[in-house]
């Protein structure tokens, strides 16, 4: 594997693991300057003339982008933290998927489908409600597609694949969250029933009707 791919893989695992807090606080002291440099990196990538072949300096913006995303994950509020984590981590893994299938031949092997699956998994991990899961998925897809539009790559795949990615991401991210909420409610009712006695129904949580003799 090229050195840049290995660095991005390690940095992605580093980002998902949530380490590096002391390093980020040491390197980045001002949130305002961090956000300014972050948007400057995005603009520099959009107008960059480099491609994927044979350019070692091409990986430098990604490493800086990952370090800024770690800082944003630590310091920003919960909604922005979920959006940045979903967008940037999926963005890095999407780049890896380009090397796995640089010329997709089938509908399943399109890079956008791989990206949507990764984004869905991240939305499952970092979302706490149904609306935030859908919102984070759509926002991260729009962010990446807008970068590709300015970049000028994969223009023929943007329209159908973006719609497919949005549908897959929303559906896959919502179902496990709904299931986890049902399981949590059921467990809470069972615990409450154990503490209150056998007078509550285990599924509905309502009091059982007792017929007088």
Positions of predicted regions on the chain:
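Alpha-helical transmembrane segments of polytopic membrane proteins
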Residues: 1-8, 56-66, 108-116, 159-169
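N-terminal signal-anchor/start-transfer transmembrane helix
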Residues: 2-24
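A generic, lipid-embedded transmembrane alpha helix
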Residues: 31-55
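Aromatic-anchored segments of alpha-helical transmembrane domains
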Residues: 38-47, 90-98, 140-150
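Membrane-interface helix termini and inter-helical loops of multi-pass transporters
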Residues: 53, 103-107, 152-157
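Membrane-proximal helix-loop-helix units in multi-pass membrane proteins
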Residues: 59-65, 70-138
